[in-house]
């Protein structure tokens, strides 16, 4: 292991991961994979979770990549990040750029349907019922005028 060169950037799922981190922590650099999900992926591949990802062989990295592609079948329903998709009704686990695109799509659907949440997003106001009288103000402060 000492005579091998470390790869400082490892590319998995179109994401550059830091090569100096252990596998279980490096996988969390992919959007949609947290510690718990990365643990499930690493356990299913049989790779040591504490091994530094930069020292892994090409076969191990391909094994990780292919496992990430199909790991949502191994996860229980409650662990997926997109349960009962409004369009298809499926349970999915979104990764990478798909999360951002799906969120934008959902917000656009809310805006098109003129739902209350969509209108709040459109106007740049708070969405989840927070008070807005004194907090969440944007822009420069004008100040108070003194009486003459």
UniProtKB/Swiss-Prot annotation:
GO cellular component, one term: cytosol
InterPro entries (alphabetical): Rbsml_uS13_C, Ribosomal_uS13, Ribosomal_uS13-like_H2TH, Ribosomal_uS13_archaeal, Ribosomal_uS13_CS
GO MF term list: rRNA binding; structural constituent of ribosome
Keyword field contains RNA-binding: yes
Region (Disordered): 128-148
Entry keyword set: Ribonucleoprotein, Ribosomal protein, RNA-binding, rRNA-binding
Function (record text): Located at the top of the head of the 30S subunit, it contacts several helices of the 16S rRNA. In the 70S ribosome it contacts the 23S rRNA (bridge B1a) and protein L5 of the 50S subunit (bridge B1b), connecting the 2 subunits; these bridges are implicated in subunit movement.
Family, as annotated: Belongs to the universal ribosomal protein uS13 family.
Quaternary structure (record): Part of the 30S ribosomal subunit. Forms a loose heterodimer with protein S19. Forms two bridges to the 50S subunit in the 70S ribosome.
Cross-referenced PANTHER family: 30S RIBOSOMAL PROTEIN S13/40S RIBOSOMAL PROTEIN S18, SMALL RIBOSOMAL SUBUNIT PROTEIN US13
UniProt-recorded name of the protein: Small ribosomal subunit protein uS13
Source species of the chain: Methanococcoides burtonii (strain DSM 6242 / NBRC 107633 / OCM 468 / ACE-M)
Species classification: Archaea, Methanobacteriati, Methanobacteriota, Stenosarchaea group, Methanomicrobia
Gene behind the chain: rps13
């Amino acid at each position: 292991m000492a005579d091998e060169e470390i790869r400082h950037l490892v590319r998995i799922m179109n994401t550059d991961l830091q090569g100096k981190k252990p596998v279980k922590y490096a996988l969390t650099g992919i959007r949609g994979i947290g510690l718990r999900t990365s643990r499930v992926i690493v356990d299913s591949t049989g790779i040591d979770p504490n091994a530094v990802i930069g020292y892994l062989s090409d076969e191990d990295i391909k094994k990780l990549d292919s496992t990430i592609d199909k790991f949502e079948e191994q996860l229980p329903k409650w662990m997926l990040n997109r349960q009962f998709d409004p369009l298809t009704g499926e349970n999915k686990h979104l990764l990478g750029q798909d999360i951002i695109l799906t969120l934008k799509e959902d917000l656009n659907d809310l805006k098109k349907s003129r739902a209350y949440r969509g209108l709040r997003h459109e106007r740049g106001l708070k969405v989840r019922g927070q008070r807005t009288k004194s907090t969440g103000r944007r822009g420069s402060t004008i100040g108070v005028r003194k009486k003459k």
